[in-house]
Amino acid sequence: MKKQNVGNACGWADRLARLLLLPALTLVLLCSCDEDKAKSERPEEGDQLWKIVPVLASESDGFEGLGEYGVSLYLFNDMSSDCYKYQHADSFGDLEPFVVEKAAYSLVALMMDRDVPHVFYEASDEAKKNTTVTVTDMNETIPDMVLGTASVSRNVGATVPVSDLQRLVGALDVRLTDVPNDVTAVELTVGDLYDRVDLTGQYDFSTGEPASKRIELTKEGTVFSARSVLMPSDETRANVKMDFRVFRGDAYEDFVVRLSGSIPADKLTRLEGRAEEILKNAELTLGLTYAPWDASITIEDHFQTDDDLNKVWSSAPLPIS
């Protein structure tokens, strides 16, 4: 009888343990199912990412060769003025896609036909939206520079056309004809110029004062001429100052030209005149007209002088910054 009682007690203990274990197993299974369901409803990491492929918009056809320019590409998150991602490539076709979280962004592309040490800008993801591009030596050859932008929102496709193209520089053609044989050299200093522009296309002066650019004209027989890319002039001024320095051996004379208007970006201006007019001791006043970047114009085939031909001009060196 005692053995039987002991056996029954053990059986009841075993059944009791099983009954206590069953709710715990059920709870574990339910939690496991809920966790699996949550995982299935949670988006994969790839669904949170977005590939942005920058391309030049079709309107870039008006900018010959732009696709082969070196490009610095900045990606800004619209919630911040800080650059989120940056890359540089030798041409637009060499750019890599940006892979980022889905959000609202803006692309800014700075394109130049060549890299030069005297054009300084922040070429990294340390850039800001108001980061500036500064020409540190205006007398050196200035490259063609074009700014392009694009807005990027969540509902666009992967390919993002960079449009809103803005050429940041202008060009000036100068041609003096019928130059006297004893003239050995001619220099032109164009004043009232900007030397800095930011990534939004706003110009200013790095020193707080207008800059200038010296251009040496090339002699071919009795013609002195030059073509130069330059930064635009201060649009708040009524005219542009041009100082011609005419050399006869080591001696020189200075002549001042005031051009009505401004020298704009994205325009080509051709200034042509007979040297016998400009070499008179008088202040010259001309009106500027403009043409597209890939065209040229002639303002006049001679220079107009004012009535006072008795002005005395200093031969002191001109300030060239």
Please describe what each predicted stretch is.
Residues 91, 114-160, 250-282:
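Structured interaction patches on ligand/partner-binding surfaces of diverse proteins
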Residues 39, 52-64, 176:
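Short amphipathic, basic-aromatic surface patches that mediate peripheral association
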Residues 34-37:
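Bacterial signal peptide processing site
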Residues 3-20:
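Bacterial N-terminal signal peptides that target proteins for export
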Residues 67-122, 184-267, 313-321:
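Tryptophan-paired
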Residues 29-32:
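C-terminal motif of bacterial Sec signal peptides marking the signal peptidase cleavage site
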Residues 248-321:
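Hydrophilic extracytoplasmic domains
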